[in-house]
């Protein structure tokens, strides 16, 4: 269902945008957007207007399990980044910007360290 909804949205956006505009939809927790904690922020932004019936576990797994959340970008030069490894400096900078303590950063970003 989530995949079908994503495809439907993709088709609607492509129909309404000029051909040269690319649409990308990086999903939190996947390689182009590996920080699972972003799900909390996305859900908080939506919770004021919508009761989606989606819950997050302590480890940011979504319930129901078929749920997915992400961001949508539309631009002629939009492309998916592939984030496999980051330096210690990038790790510390990102954690500081997100307001993560060391334990949270290690838990959700540690696998990305070179």
Predicted ranges, named:
Residues 2-83, 89, 100, 108-110:
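Small-residue-enriched alpha-helical segments and adjacent helix-cap loops
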Residues 112-114:
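C-terminal anchoring/interaction modules
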